[in-house]
Structure formats: C-alpha cells, structure tokens
C-alpha cells in the first residue's frame, strides 16, 4: 500500500514499513511489482528496499534491498490476473471476507474512560452533554455491558444507537484504545465472561464482536488482568470473530507482523467452529493478503485531501495483490465537515469495508453524527451497500484468484490514456460500475452541491446509475452535476447486477429471494457466487455459482436466462422467489416466462404494491424513482 499512488513510472518508491499514513507514505509494502509488458518480480526478503522506475535513468528499472545476497522470483505471464496469480502461488491467495465484514464496523474503547457533564460535550440519550477523560475525575466510568448505571456509555448502547437510527452495522470492537481491556474483574476469566456477555447481546442483534490488539495475544506472566489476553478463549468462549492489529503489536511489521496475523488466521477457524477469520492489519508484507485485509492507518478527516489520496491508494492496493483494503470513515481525527463526510460515505459504498473509528475526532464517528442532511444521505448509501451484497460478494470471490474488486481503468480498458495517472481518481467496481468520487470542491455552493470534471468513460454506453441518463463512451465528461446527495457512478449498458433486500446486517438478508437488475444491451453475462458467508467451507469447494445471461435480439426483444445453480453449501436455500428489474425505455409489447420447459403465465400488476404482494406478475414503472 503506497498511499496516494498506484502508477510508479518515473518515481522511486520505498519498500519498507514507515508507519506513515498520509500521501507519499508507505502503510503496507510488498516487495513485488509487475509490468503491463508481461513480467513480474518478487524479492524473497524482509529487508528494506528502494524501487526506481526510471527516476534516475529514463527507461531503466533499478531495484535494491538492504541485503548482501540476491533472492528473486521472476514471473513471465500475460496480463494482470496471470501475474497476480503467480504472486499468489508464492505467497497465498487473498482471503474472502465474511459477509458481515462488508458492513460498517464501529471501533472505540468502552472499558476505560470516565464521563462528566459538560455543556460543550457530546449529547447523549438522557438529553445531557458529557465529556470523557481517561483519568478518574469522579465521573461515571463506562463498561462494555452498561450494568453499573452507565448504560448510555456502554458498548451495548452503540449497537442500540445504530439500530435506533436505522443504520447498518456489521461488527463492533469495544477495546480499541490503549489501556482499555474488555473487563473490570480481577481475573482474565472474569473479563472473558464480560466480553462473552457483550458478544451474546451483539449476536442477538446481528452484530459480531472483535478485538483490537495492543499486546501479546496469549497469556503472559506479570500482565494485569485488565490487559491480559488469551486469544483462544476470546475466540472459543466469547465468540470473537474480528481482530484489528495496530502498531503497538505489529509495528515492526515484516516477519513479525506476518507471523502475528498467521497465528490468528489459524486460531480463529480451529477454536471458532470453522469461523472465517476477519483480520484487519497494517504494516503488512508479501503474504499478508492470505490472512488479512489492510487499513491505511490513522489520518485526519473533514478535509478533501483525505478522500483524494485514498482513491489511488485503494486502486494500487488491488494491483499489488491486496484487494481487501479499507480506511476510517471520514478519518480517525478531525471531521465536522458535512460535505467531506457525506462524500466519503458515498464512494466507500463501492469498496469492501468501512470503519467508524470513534473517540478521537472533532465529532463522534457515527453515520448520523452530523445531523441532517448527512444522516439521511449516509443511511441511503449504507442501505445501498447492503443491497449490493450479492454483487459485491461475487466480485470479492473473483478477487481471490482474479481481478481485484476495485479496478484501475486500464485493467478492463487498456489504452494510452488509462495506463498512467490520468484516471487515478476513478475506478471500476467489478465489471459493471464506474465510480468517480467527489474528492475536491470544484464549484460547490454553500450546501455542497458541486460538479465533477474529468470523468473518463471508456468505449460502450454508460448509464447514470441514479437518473438513467445515457452517455456514449470514448469521451471525457466534464461539468457532471453532483448535488450533495449524488455520487457520480455509472453502470455499463449490458450490466447484470445481483441484489438483495435493503438490510442492516446479514441476519436481515432474505435468503428466499434473489433479485437481478439488468440493463439489456447486446449479449452479456454475470456469474453470481454465494456461500455460507461465515466459515472456511468455501476453501473446501462449498459454494454456489449461478450464471445469468442477457441478450437483445434482432427484433429488439430481450431474453434473460438464469441457468441452474451449481454447487451447494450449508444453509443454501434452493427454492427462491426470483425478481427481475429490467431497465427498458418503453412498455414491452409482451412479457413471457418459462421455468425449464414449463411456460408460466404472467399477470400485469396495476401498482407497485400489487406487484410486491403478487406471484407470477410483472409491472411497468414508467417513471421509476432511481434515487
């Protein structure tokens, strides 16, 4: 992860853990590079390095590591996928995140601080404002479960808060802060029980729990019960399913960091009933992707620079064999800027993970923290992210041994314009979405309504995802209207997008329905992937693929074919309701359906409500509300 960069021609980059989190810093280096000329190189070393891509001498690549011997793997292959798979053959394939990991996570410390009334503090549910202190100032001490007349300051209250504001939440880390721990008893086992109590409550509400790492993960003599750790009991007894590493534990990086995530990567399935590990790390190296996703470090939100440099950072991470990349929502520090806050939530809808790192910023790091209009906009995009889960999960599975989820434009559309930095502020999310985030104030008014310039639309026809307006490709789009609510995102004509019902966590997904949104054009297809979303079964071949095809005939007729699902997994629902959302320009003359060789008679519904309640029905929405 080279922050702020992905195209290195004419540059020198450092291959070392710098613990530098802003533009130009190195968060998680990999001693590997590949070229569009059809080759790649990986150094087998943990030593620091410098890679010069024609900076000192044009046309020459000069690589060096602080080592007295040369140990390098050379890879000769055709294309990004083949070269990435050569790298994975040596270092391991990227992990497929559990489904809950695609939802927001909330991170803070809820076992350490004291809260006193203060008119300039944070407004709580009792109508009063409070300020926190890490020192005992006579205030109310927080706890995980709120059992000490302190519920509104507890970790349980966080879960309630998301629920009461109708906001999606997938997981919670209650000890993300130095000296926090997760219990206030005199024994480690007592604290484990306290953590389990939180875990039970969280799981009842569709939320998983995890832990931040400050120290050794296994019992160690001389460490107080507060900071003592036992990862085996945390996983086996308390139900921990997430681990976030930080510089206090893997700050050395290199082999130490790699061994650390590998340890947890083996413990979680073994002691967690085959649970799929969800590890978020930094200071990674070649091989980190086998066990963990990466976060980019601690940065300041509330400023446009935060969004700007992260776009090429995410693109570069996928190109470097680490498709599971994330960062804090609107930063860990700073904030109080509605425009930046909403724009960050918007573009990260089309990324794997979202972290609300609370407790350090100018405001609380909740999606509703800045009030309206940010609350409604953020909620709407979070719900959209939940709807897109079948599409996101399918491209995440592809990223295990194929294209990354977040794709540089040149991966799908290689040409002189895309093979450089001209398109560094836009990307493809899978094969069908083109995302062009708002990363600066161009002509913004006081409400944050703005425009986006320099959007490159490749060949083909591209459709504004929120208005349905069509644009011919092979052009640069300027002055694209982007009111505060609107992310510039385009869907390729011919797209097939698997969807699910809007939801707040994986438990709310209706497994008995499958939804496909289609933009018929020519002949196109998409392979949907699904599995249980929680276990390591997928590594043993347990999963289901469904091929969906769309074809526009010579008479402008559209045929959509869903082929029989292949495979199986624990909990797979074989009998499902199927809903098509087919984007057309006028009412079709005829709509027919066939299941196998059996024709199904369809009835025209008179309203959306009748359509939603009916079976074997169709409805033509002449003016759909796309936003």
Language model feature labels by segment:
Residues 266, 278, 288-294, 313, ...:
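Catalytic core of carbohydrate-active enzymes
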Residues 22-26, 80-83, 115-226:
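Aromatic- and glycine-enriched glycan-recognition loops and surfaces
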């Amino acid at each position: 992860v080279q922050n702020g960069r992905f195209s290195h021609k004419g540059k020198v980059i450092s291959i070392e853990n710098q613990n530098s989190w802003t533009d130009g810093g190195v968060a998680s280096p990999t001693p590997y590079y590949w070229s569009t000329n059809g080759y790649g190189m990986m150094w087998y070393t943990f030593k620091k390095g410098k890679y010069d891509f024609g900076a000192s001498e044009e046309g020459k690549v000069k690589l060096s590591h602080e080592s007295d011997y040369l140990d390098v793997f050379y890879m000769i292959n055709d294309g990004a996928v083949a070269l990435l798979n050569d790298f994975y053959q040596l270092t391991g394939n990227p992990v497929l995140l559990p489904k809950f990991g695609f939802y927001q996570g909330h991170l803070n410390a809820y076992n350490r601080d004291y809260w006193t009334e203060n008119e300039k503090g944070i407004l709580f549910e009792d109508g009063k404002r409070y300020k926190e202190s890490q020192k005992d100032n006579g205030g109310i001490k927080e706890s995980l479960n709120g059992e000490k007349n302190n519920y509104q300051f507890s970790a349980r209250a966080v879960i309630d808060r998301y629920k009461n504001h109708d906001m999606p939440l997938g997981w919670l880390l209650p000890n993300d802060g130095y000296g926090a721990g997760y219990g206030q008893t005199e024994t480690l086992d007592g604290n484990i029980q306290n953590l389990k109590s939180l875990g039970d409550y969280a799981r009842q509400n569709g939320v998983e729990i995890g832990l931040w790492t400050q120290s050794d993960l296994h019992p160690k003599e001389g460490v107080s019960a507060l900071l003592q750790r036992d990862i085996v009991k945390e996983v086996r007894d308390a139900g921990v399913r997430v681990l976030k590493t930080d510089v206090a534990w893997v700050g050395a990086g290199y082999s130490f960091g790699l061994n650390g995530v590998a340890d947890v990567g083996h413990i979680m399935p073994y002691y967690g009933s085959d649970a799929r590990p969800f590890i978020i790390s930094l200071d990674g190296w070649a091989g980190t992707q086998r066990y963990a996703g990466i976060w980019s470090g601690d940065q300041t939100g509330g400023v446009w620079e935060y969004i700007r440099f992260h776009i090429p950072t995410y693109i570069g991470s996928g190109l470097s064999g680490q498709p599971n990349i994330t960062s804090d929502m609107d930063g860990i520090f700073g904030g109080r800027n509605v425009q930046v806050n909403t724009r960050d939530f918007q573009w990260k809808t089309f990324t794997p993970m979202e972290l609300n790192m609370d407790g350090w910023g100018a405001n609380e790091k909740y999606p509703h923290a800045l009030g309206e209009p940010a609350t409604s906009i953020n909620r709407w995009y979070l719900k959209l992210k939940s709807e897109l889960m079948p599409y996101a999960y399918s491209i995440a599975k592809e990223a295990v041994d194929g294209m990354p989820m977040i794709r540089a434009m040149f991966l799908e559309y290689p040409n002189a314009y895309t093979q450089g930095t001209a398109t560094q502020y836009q990307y493809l999310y899978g094969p069908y979405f083109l995302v062009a985030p708002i990363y600066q104030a161009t002509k913004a008014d006081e409400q944050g309504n703005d425009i986006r310039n320099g959007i490159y639309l490749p060949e083909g026809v591209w459709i504004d995802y929120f208005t349905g307006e069509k644009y011919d490709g092979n052009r640069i789009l300027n002055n694209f209207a982007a009111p505060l609510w609107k992310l510039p995102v385009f869907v390729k004509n011919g797209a097939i997008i698997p969807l699910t019902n809007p939801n707040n966590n994986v438990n709310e997904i209706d497994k008995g329905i499958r939804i496909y949104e289609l933009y018929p054009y020519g002949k196109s297809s998409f392979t949907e992937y699904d599995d249980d979303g929680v276990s390591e079964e997928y590594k043993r071949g347990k999963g289901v693929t469904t091929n969906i095809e769309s074809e526009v005939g010579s008479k402008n007729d559209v045929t959509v074919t869903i082929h029989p699902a292949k495979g199986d997994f624990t909990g797979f629902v074989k009998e499902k309701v199927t809903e098509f959302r087919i984007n057309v320009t006028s009412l079709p003359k005829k709509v027919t359906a066939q299941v196998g060789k059996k024709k199904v008679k369809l009835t025209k519904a008179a309203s959306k409500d009748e359509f939603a309640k009916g079976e074997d029905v169709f409805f033509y929405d002449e003016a759909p509300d796309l936003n």
